[in-house]
Amino acid sequence: MKFKEVVYNGTPVTEEHKIVKILQKEGFYWLIDSETEDACIEIIHKTIIWNSGNFYSGNWHYGIWKNGNFYGRWENGIFENGTFKGKFISGIGDPSVRV
């Protein structure tokens, strides 16, 4: 399952077809096109907050990464925690310089 849960307008949504419709409505086509597994996310003020799950491939355009496994191309956003094995282009919390 690509998406396990999306919290949207304070309401958890767990049915994948409903999650995809929400992502389309908000313009997050890049996330729909990415290869993900068991993603638990929130949408707050038109920003993706990734709480857990796997992002295997695709371009992460912008959002806040709280936790999970990232293997894609990070174009911009805030990386707070998790496993990073992707390519970092720009953003805050560059995982390649962590000690």
Predicted regions and their residues:
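Short, intrinsically disordered N-terminal pre-domain segments
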Residues: 1-15
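Extended beta-solenoid/beta-helix repeat architectures
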Residues: 14-99
